[in-house]
Amino acid sequence: MPREDRATWKSNYFLKIIQLLDDYPKCFIVGADNVGSKQMQQIRMSLRGKAVVLMGKNTMMRKAIRGHLENNPALEKLLPHIRGNVGFVFTKEDLTEIRDMLLANKVPAAARAGAIAPCEVTVPAQNTGLGPEKTSFFQALGITTKISRGTIEILSDVQLIKTGDKVGASEATLLNMLNISPFSFGLVIQQVFDNGSIYNPEVLDITEETLHSRFLEGVRNVASVCLQIGYPTVASVPHSIINGYKRVLALSVETDYTFPLAEKVKAFLADPSAFVAAAPVAAAPAAAPAATTAAPAKVEAKEESEESDEDMGFGLFD
């Protein structure tokens, strides 16, 4: 089969991206740094039937989207985010599910000198199994060690690389010697496009529990402010009523004014001992049956003791 010329290939690519944008209401803009062809093939296979991955040159993707803005103006929101080594993952499924599938396809990778660290790298305290001749190597990196049974032992956890730092040759060599693959590479979600709206992927981590707690926190803040400024709202009125009742109750206690709910409080303040005495009286009837049941048991035990004594006497004098 003859290979299609470049003009035909471009035309087909434009048609494909436009068709995907029309057919799929949701997509991810993903970064593909350090993702090889073999890993990309594995990602496509794992997403088959659930999502479609489309990569390409940024200029071609922008041109295709700009040419389709008349039919779908919301696509213009994608343009500022098409920069760097990026692509699209189109889907009709739950976005969180597809996000989790992308994360599952990340693969561990060794540190390479000159690479930018995507995460912090910490070397744990351990016996390295390396011989004493490597001691100077650890000293050059500022790692405290000791010789234990003829091998180098790292005494405490060491933060070797910070996020965003360039990996040095010494750090890369050390991690390789310790067989540590600190990084993992895969498609990284940069933005989420959902039915014309675009937002940060962190929004996918918001659960119903998160929304509920944030809502309650907002209600508490509104109630607090409204109570301070004396402005009644649905959130503050219950607290205002309770506070008002407390003030009326305090006024009733200090004056001759009274009402039914205040009578019990006044009676308690007038004679607290009456309430204290009422508690043992209420507990006494419950304790009485236990005492009566214990008494017959004691009598039965005494009778059994007398019978055993009599038996002992007959046995001795027979």
UniProtKB/Swiss-Prot annotation:
Residues 303-312 have a biased composition (Acidic residues). Gene3D superfamilies: 3.30.70.1730, 3.90.105.20. The keyword Kinase does not apply. It is found in: Nucleus; Cytoplasm. GO terms for molecular function: large ribosomal subunit rRNA binding; structural constituent of ribosome. GO terms for biological process: cytoplasmic translation; ribosome biogenesis. Keywords: Cytoplasm, Isopeptide bond, Nucleus, Phosphoprotein, Ribonucleoprotein, Ribosomal protein, Ubl conjugation. Residues 293-318 are annotated as: Disordered. There is a cross-link at K298 (Glycyl lysine isopeptide (Lys-Gly) (interchain with G-Cter in SUMO1)). Ribosomal protein P0 is the functional equivalent of E.coli protein L10. P0 forms a pentameric complex by interaction with dimers of P1 and P2. Identified in a IGF2BP1-dependent mRNP granule complex containing untranslated mRNAs. Interacts with APEX1. Interacts with FMR1. This is Large ribosomal subunit protein uL10. It comes from Bos taurus. The lineage of its organism: Eukaryota, Metazoa, Chordata, Craniata, Vertebrata. The gene is RPLP0.
